[in-house]
Amino acid sequence: MFRNSLKMLLTGGKSSRKNRSSDGGSEEPPDRRQSSVDSRQSRSGPGGISTESDCAFEPDYAVPALPVSEGDVEQELGPPPSVDEAANTLMTRLGFLLGEKVTEVQPGDQYSMEVQDENQTSAITQRISPCSTLTSSTASPPASSPCSTLPPVSTNATAKDCSYGAVTSPTSTLESRDSGIIATLTNYSENMERTKYVGEAGKELGSGGNLKPWQSQKSSMDSCLYRVDENMAASTYSLNKIPERNLETVLSQSVQSIPLYLMPRPNSVAATSSAHLEDLAYLDEQRHTPLRTSLRMPRQSMSGARTQQDLRVRFAPYRPPDISLKPLLFEVPSITTESVFVGRDWVFHEIDAQLQSSNASVNQGVVIVGNIGFGKTAIISRLVALSCHGTRMRQIASDSPHASPKHVDANRELPLTQAPSAHSSIASGSCPGTPEMRRRQEEAMRRLASQVVAYHYCQADNAYTCLVPEFVHNVAALLCRSPQLTAYREQLLREPHLQSMLSLRSCVQDPMASFRRGVLEPLENLHKERKIPDEDFIILIDGLNEAEFHKPDYGDTIVSFLSKMIGNFPSWLKLIVTVRTSLQEITKLLPFHRIFLDRLEENEAIDQDLQAYILHRIHSSSEIQNNISLNGKMDNTTFGKLSSHLKTLSQGSYLYLKLTFDLIEKGYLVLKSSSYKVVPVSLSEVYLLQCNMKFPTQSSFDRVMPLLNVAVASLHPLTDEHIFQAINAGSIEGTLEWEDFQQRMENLSMFLIKRRDMTRMFVHPSFREWLIWREEGEKTKFLCDPRSGHTLLAFWFSRQEGKLNRQQTIELGHHILKAHIFKGLSKKVGVSSSILQGLWISYSTEGLSMALASLRNLYTPNIKVSRLLILGGANINYRTEVLNNAPILCVQSHLGYTEMVALLLEFGANVDASSESGLTPLGYAAAAGFLSIVVLLCKKRAKVDHLDKNGQCALVHAALRGHLEVVKFLIQCDWTMAGQQQGVFKKSQAIQQALIAAASMGYTEIVSYLLDLPEKDEEEVERAQINSFDSLWGETALTAAAGRGKLDVCRLLLEQGAAVAQPNRRGAVPLFSTVRQGHWQIVDLLLTHGADVNMADKQGRTPLMMAASEGHLGTVDFLLAQGASIALMDKEGLTALSWACLKGHLSVVRSLVDNGAATDHADKNGRTPLDLAAFYGDAEVVQFLVDHGAMIEHVDYSGMRPLDRAVGCRNTSVVVTLLKKGAKIGPATWAMATSKPDIMIILLSKLMEEGDMFYKKGKVKEAAQRYQYALKKFPREGFGEDLKTFRELKVSLLLNLSRCRRKMNDFGMAEEFATKALELKPKSYEAYYARARAKRSSRQFAAALEDLKEAIKLCPNNREIQRLLMRVEEECRQMQQQQQPPPPPQQPPEELPEEETEPEPQPEDIYSVQDIFEEEYLEQDVENVSIGLQTEARPSQGLPVIQSPPSSPAHRDSAYISSSPLGSHQVFDFRSNSSVGSPTRQGYQSTSPALSPTHQNSHYRPSPPHTSPAHQGASYRFSPPPVGGQGKEYPSPPPSPLRRGPQYRASPPAESMSIYRSQSGSPVRYQQEANVSQLPGRPKSPLSKMAQRPYQMPQLPVAVPQQGLRLQPAKAQIVRSNQPSSAVHSSTVIPTGAYGQVAHPMASKYQSSQGDMGVSQSRLVYQGSIGGIVGDGRPVQHVQASLSAGAICQHGGLTKEDLPQRPSSAYRGGMRYSQTPQIGRSQSASYYPVCHSKLDLERSSSQLGSPDVSHLIRRPISVNPNEIKPHPPTPRPLLHSQSVGLRFSPSSNSISSTANLTPTFRPSSSIQQMEIPLKPAYDRSCDELSPVSPTQGGYPSEPTRSRTTPFMGIIDKTARTQQYPHLHQQNRTWAVSSVDTVLSPTSPGNLSQPESFSPPSSISNIAFYNKTNNAQNGHLLEDDYYSPHGMLANGSRGDLLERVSQASSYPDVKVARTLPVAQAYQDNLYRQLSRDSRQGQTSPIKPKRPFVESNV
């Protein structure tokens, strides 16, 4: 009856609310919960917050009925004395006050229950300190809670906030449905299931403890508030404030965007209390604009607004949402935007000096001590304002105009931020010290401020700010926002567990660990790593004394926390703290320097500061001046008197001065008398005066007194709405109207300042204290009654519609206890007041159990509130969310909170209730070492022998942790009952286990105690047995201690007689236990006690094997030193080395091998250490063993080798190591590699490498075998992720095979392989290119052209492709011409030019195609070497096969020259094919390397200017202009040196070029030209002289225009050589007159071409092909004829690009000069520079010395064309004959240079370069040149290739070939005696000359050189190219010849040969050439390419 009536009274008829039954865990049955949740949810707004009843106060804020506990309250409380009496009592006390619930409340005003939750939470968390039960009871009020500091949530935000809360931020997690934070966690999980947010939050919580799913389903409010509320006390969302904006915000922010643990926690203190710990939403809210509505208000609306903000926070850059730490919102009402800071520089100076001092006892921090109002907070705020956090000052300083009476000129900007200096605001005289001193002091202040990284204000009226968890969390949040510590922020973002560690939940559970591991250790590490500045940092803490007001029953205050932690602070992290003088004792443990602000008499600076402030106030206000001046005058005397009087009264208090001046300024004080009697004498009188003025009558004060009472009693700032609701909660009749309330609040606005979050704080802590307490003798007027405020707040919480969250529940309990409204009733009613209070709280909320078990109340319990909760029906056996869902008693036992344990036991908590791990409270207490709690529990008959799930009893737990006293107590306990009950576990077993546990952990005292136990009643069971193993771990004491390395315990045990050989249960003896762990000191101890160093275990393993297996090097070395045998084997035949290898311990392997271990020992399975190491997979061990003689091909009994094992185990690093060491890939290897794509790739790559190696060595057949084998082994399937890699690998293999097949003349297969590659990789331009080469080799020019067009589409910038394309186009034309009767040589040249130029690879192309090209380059070399020109004699001569090294860049130039589009204007590369072609070509060394065939081709073909000289050289192919069209410019390959001579000299450049041997073109053509252009006597070119060939060619038969070989009209042909000087030209001296004549026209032409080429020096060399006499007196024609072949070739070969492209210097050929200007037979000819102009001649002569010249001289004209090209200035040798095969490279080095220049491209550029020389040579070899010459001219392989472009001026390869044979002979025979002398086109020397270096004359040498040239020049293509056309008559020999020609490129290429090439030789050559050309290609020689394919 009583309960019901009371309930009806309180609830206003609503009896739905029930308290949780005290029994079992849940406060209400799950179904009911569910239903209520559902019902609430149904009406909750978004976020699950109920819009109706959720609101703390709905429009009607009737107080919800107090729920009755389900289990009858009577049971717990006992039957009430009399229902009626109790009911009457409550009615009397409460009834009148409560009356009916007030139903109407202004929507905005509704006060949420959340506030209550927060308060409650705080209360729970904190013990009620004597000063304030509130404090202790409430950790932090939720924002919405009446006490909450958080701004109320706006209506829209409400819903969201709530949901946010529901979602539970990490903090909120704390508050779960279950009471308390722990409950929060639990609920949190449930909610998590329901909300994604929750999910995130759960993670964090999870880390802390198990979260129970929130039972938020009960009601929307439940869900919302609950989760929120309960989860976070701080959230107190349930109270209107927090939930609405904060929770929502926090949740939304934290939950949605970040993981739970990252979710921002409401930074409210309450957060940890029963409200959600993680919901610091209120803090967030504070950050946001304050919302007026209470959290409880309709959530949806509130949440809406809040949500948007939250979203902003979440997604906006604001702060990366991932940082979940949220700073507390601090507002300091006493600091306003108008506050002025004056003076006190001395304080900063002293602080700075102390912090920088070297005295470690005081440099860690400073304590600023002063009385209230003395400026401590202002000093801290000043530093904050000037610090990196200065922007947050707006949050600290209050904007409120009422903040202080003085708001006259409120400058919006914080003065603190401006940091006015004392002297700035005061008359200069008033400031202490000189300006310099002041400046230094101000600098000190700014320096200190710059070091501030965090700050914290403790405010007694905002409990959250006084709690340690919030302090830690706030400091961490500010640290990570400090710009100096960005590295710390990044680390928090990188390591989410650190954020979790700093979550409010973690801070509540263990603030010290959180601070140490989340702040101090990371900062220390960052400092060591120099990631943060190496300077001091400062943390500011204001008002340590304020925090004492909220001191918890258990746990630290901020001061005690700092005292314990300061020892862990790094020396560079300083603290500046402030404390009130009266409480300075609390800081005595801090080793800080102290600065006193109130010792006015001792410190003159304080007086000066006060004086400055007074002066500032007087001067800054005319009102003050008027009020204090006597007779309207303000004289110094008056001022001094007033100043002195005020300073005396203030005693140093700035607050007193400020308030007094405010009164004077406003006219409330008028100082007209000199006695100043009206001035208040103390701060108390100032407040009294202010109140008297504000409230003149008692009734006026009575109207506002309830508001002040509520504000004083609240734990945190409340919004106006909350205060309004709280006041109305106490009215029975007629509620206060909102307008009336607002009016009253306005009257208080100067005392209760509105913060940004719309909550109200007292203007100053001193005013709050003045309202509560007065000193003796002071007037008691205006004293407030905090009890009344507590009562109103308690009623307000009771009337909340929704269920209170944990924080609010604890706040409610706090207020109920503080209100104490039943005081004195117990006697009257017969019911104890505590029972009545329990009934009250049980009727007011359902979450008692959850509040009791909230995190904050678990870790910082409020004993009184907890008792109240238990009285109200909280379940004392409620399972928490921590310690494996341990019951509350377990947690309190673990924490050592004796009072709480006693309280729980008093109310009958289950003493043996266990957590999920099976531990009981006794186990927790024993493990933690709390003897008092162990005793308490044992008195309650806790089971001593209870075993947890690990089989450990409390005694073992105590022994494991070294708690001797607990061990002693437990052993003395009575185990009999327990033993009888269980019948299994006996005390003796426990003691034995305890012995092992203590021994393993090294607790010698416990071991000794247990061993010395008395033998009770003669029963040995009591005493532990030293040699027995226990029943738990199976260890003996000695094996346990030895295994854990406990040396002292081992000594003790051995002294006590422990057996050294006594094994444990597994049979392991102590020696093995310790060896396994590597404790060599204990090994030593055991050995000294008789252990055998070589003893073996059951498997035959010795300690040495064990140590080696485990990798303990120190132990291994120690055992070896102690005589351990290194050769012993275990039962498997494994030695110590085998074990070390099997486990991959390199250091041990090294040690054992050094000590003589056998590396070839085989075990019983035949496995050597290397096998085992390969099995393990440590490549370093494998490498070491192989280096030390291990057999790499050893086969074990199963047929496996180390490589096979490594493959089988997929140890790729070992596979690679073994393959590098030469391991063979056998069938087993392939078998093991099956389905291991990574291994297959390695093996196939190895095969490909081997193939590449053979290929480069010229062993094409072997290379092809390797590639074929690799393809055969290619896996059919199972590529998986490696599909792309395998495809690329296969494409490479196919392309390589294609190359090899082409080299092997198997063009069909080559084409087929390239096609397969295309099928695999349709977009592969390399494949198109390879197939085109194959088709070209088989003379399918049209098809090759198609492929090349495709390739050029795919890779438009690849010069190799471009060059080959041009050549193939030229060849196509030539083909057409060939089909017709051999046209005059001129025609082919036309075609040639196109072919000639191969596009020069661009770097990018090079890399992609490089392999191909390089290989081709190599191929060409190989081919050059391998394939001899079929021409019989020629090969040998041409063979001065110096295989011209691939054309060096010089060659390229030549190529360029020839390739110049002018084609017709072919600059003559005067490179002697012969020895000049040698590497030196040197002398000439046009940058282009010796031209490889490729180069030659390019020479013929104009090559892009960018092409290297070699390429230019390559452009040599010129198609001779039609016979009739001499005047026309045709790109024609430079005629072979012989042919060229005449052409060049006589014919216009283009035409002369056209002279190239047309296919039919034969020497005749040259002769013709020669005749035409012969000049009477051509002076010998210096080249010829230099060539050391005195051979002046006797007049060659001048006109032997044989066959179609037409010499161009004797127009001077301009030979453009890239070489700056016309050395080349000069070397072939052409009579100036003749040349001059022709030169001009040519020059003009060439110049234009040159311009195109961009060759700076390119010189037009006139080759006076018009009959002239060479210096020797031969008719110029002859010379021309000889020269024409080369020169023309060269000339034609020059491209614009070629000429200009490379300065001679550019070509690698620095060597150009180095080589003696030997003019190989061909060389001289080719170089026979036709200097058309005197300049050219001069240059050439001068350049002879110069590299350019030397090229000219050395190289046969034909050979050198490439070389010459590089040097535009150098004229090309007139002789074209040899040139045909060769490219002239300007530099003798050209070959080498080419290689150097484009090693990567070797294939491309080098080949091209080489090609020029080679090409002519090839052409010759193929067409008509002697085999030798082709060789010289082209890459060895080139000769085989028939050139479409006139080679050496002969287009028809046949002609060339024919020429070659003759030339071959002749070339050697004829030498250009003078520079004029032209080498016969065929002379091998000339041909080879293009190569930069002169290979040995022998064919082999030639081959070598060719190879080199090819490699360097990369242009072998032309040889190949030409050979098909008219391979040398000899056929394959032609190739050789070309090669030889290239080889000849050495200058060495037997000068003799060249010399022999006398005129007669030349004549013969010409004749032969003409014949050959007429004949056409005699033998189809497949054009061979230089090794480098790039040279087409």
Swiss-Prot record:
PROSITE patterns: ANK_REP_REGION, ANK_REPEAT, TPR, TPR_REGION. Keywords: ANK repeat, Cell projection, Glycoprotein, Methylation, Phosphoprotein, Repeat, Synapse, TPR repeat. The keyword Electron transport does not apply. The modification Asymmetric dimethylarginine is found at residues 1565, 1578. Residues 419-428, 1471-1500, 1794-1805 have a biased composition (Polar residues). Residues 1380-1390 have a biased composition (Pro residues). TPR repeats lie at residues 1244-1277, 1291-1324, 1325-1358. Gene3D superfamilies: Ankyrin repeat-containing domain, Tetratricopeptide repeat domain. Its main location: other. It is found in: Cell projection, Dendritic spine. GO terms for molecular function: structural constituent of postsynaptic density. Glycans are attached at residue 1930. Belongs to the TANC family. This is Protein TANC2. It comes from Rattus norvegicus.
